[in-house]
């Protein structure tokens, strides 16, 4: 009798995706982050569902409903803090996942890569609307500042902002629709994840060498299921440690105060995972220019496959490009730091230099290094 998992219409799909999937024998721990992102998404959807049972999306009661969840609901404090810090874990895994894709040339699978970029944008949108829901000071002013950026769009900008707000300021209508968006977007993310996996399984996984691994494949189960399980345990442990011991470490103290439209916080800033983009936005003194740079900082990922000049796919054997990659990583850390600082010298000039460097490394230096490394491969005798 043939095994049920190989014949049953539903089990067959799961089997081909997670059990009998041929995987390269040499993929490292950097390949764990895709499955970790899956776990993050599941954790966020489950904790979010339980939070939605007790949350009210009304300006008068939103803040107190979050306080009620933390004080009166059984394990509400745990669910709320896991959801808030789970978002940080999600973005940590996302950034590593994208970084691994750039380092090992996974962007050469263009469909998988492009859907991944769309996924990144969708998750960022989900996190942004979710940040507004507790209706604290930074929630309110963050929503006001970021949505207001759309007013930089010529001609239709102001109308567009008022349409999104549902009025002439961020108010009850805005909060209600943001809750609706925050509820629906994770399901859209889940659908995109399935498409992302569909395209990935068309080509098979890349591997650290960037060479064709077809000659040496192993089944996903048990080798990578056990490897992924170790990743799950480590990530969930890290999340629980953060949640139990310092749940407010990554949050903003201003969010302990209810939203007050009459009182602006001295420094408006988003959560840590948006600070790099926020720093790029602020480094350009023109409003429309800043918005375009903000968009470009993420959308530039879409043109990375077009900028690949090297004869080798991976950076594993390319020391010059490796150096540039780690310079880019350092540059993003500098931008993250600058995004959290007030708009004054020397932070302004540091932010401007870091922003220019970010775009230069991706658009100019990496392709040039690829061409130079090609030249170095040629025998010189």
From Swiss-Prot:
Superkingdom: Eukaryota
Membrane topology: Multi-pass membrane protein
Binding residues annotated for a ubiquinone, in chain numbering: 201
Residues the record lists as binding heme b b562: 83, 182
Species, as recorded: Macrotis lagotis (Greater bilby)
UniProt miscellaneous comment: Heme 1 (or BL or b562) is low-potential and absorbs at about 562 nm, and heme 2 (or BH or b566) is high-potential and absorbs at about 566 nm.
Biological processes, Gene Ontology terms: mitochondrial electron transport, ubiquinol to cytochrome c
Entry protein name: Cytochrome b
SUPFAM superfamilies from the UniProt entry: a domain/subunit of cytochrome bc1 complex (Ubiquinol-cytochrome c reductase) (SSF81648), Transmembrane di-heme cytochromes (SSF81342)
Protein location: Mitochondrion inner membrane
């Amino acid at each position: 009798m043939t095994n049920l998992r190989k014949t049953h219409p539903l089990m067959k799909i799961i089997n081909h995706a997670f059990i009998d999937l041929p995987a390269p024998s040499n993929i490292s721990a950097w390949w764990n982050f895709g499955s970790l992102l899956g776990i993050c998404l599941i954790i966020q959807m489950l904790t979010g569902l339980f939070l939605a049972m007790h949350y009210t999306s009304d300006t008068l009661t939103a803040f107190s409903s979050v306080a009620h969840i933390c004080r009166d609901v059984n394990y509400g404090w745990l669910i709320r803090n896991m959801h808030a810090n789970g978002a940080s874990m999600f973005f940590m895994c996302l950034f590593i996942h994208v970084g691994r894709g750039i380092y090992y040339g996974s962007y050469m699978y263009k469909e998988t890569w492009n859907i991944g970029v769309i996924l990144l944008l969708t998750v960022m949108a989900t996190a942004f609307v979710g940040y507004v829901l507790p209706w604290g000071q930074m929630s309110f002013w963050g929503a006001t500042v970021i949505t207001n950026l759309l007013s930089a769009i010529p001609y239709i900008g102001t109308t567009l902002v008022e349409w999104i707000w549902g009025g002439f300021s961020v108010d009850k209508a805005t909060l209600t629709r943001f809750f609706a968006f925050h509820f629906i977007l994770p399901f859209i993310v889940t659908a995109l994840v399935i498409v992302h996996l569909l395209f990935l399984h068309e080509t098979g996984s890349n591997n650290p060498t960037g060479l064709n691994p077809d000659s040496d494949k192993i089944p996903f189960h048990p080798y990578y299921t056990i490897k992924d399980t170790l990743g799950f345990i480590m990530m969930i442990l890290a999340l629980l440690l953060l949640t139990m011991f310092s749940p407010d470490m990554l949050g903003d103290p201003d969010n302990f105060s209810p939203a007050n439209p009459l009182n602006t916080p001295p420094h408006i800033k988003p959560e840590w995972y948006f600070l790099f983009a926020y720093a790029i936005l602020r480094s350009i003194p023109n409003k429309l220019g800043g918005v375009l740079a903000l968009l470009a900082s993420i959308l530039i990922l879409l043109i990375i496959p077009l900028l690949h000049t090297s004869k080798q796919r991976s950076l594993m054997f390319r020391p010059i490009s490796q150096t540039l990659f780690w310079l880019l990583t350092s540059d993003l850390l500098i931008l993250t730091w600058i995004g959290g600082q007030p708009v004054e010298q020397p932070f302004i000039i540091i932010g401007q230099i870091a922003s220019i460097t970010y775009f230069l490394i991706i658009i100019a230096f990496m392709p040039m290094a690829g061409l130079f490394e090609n030249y170095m491969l040629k025998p010189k005798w």
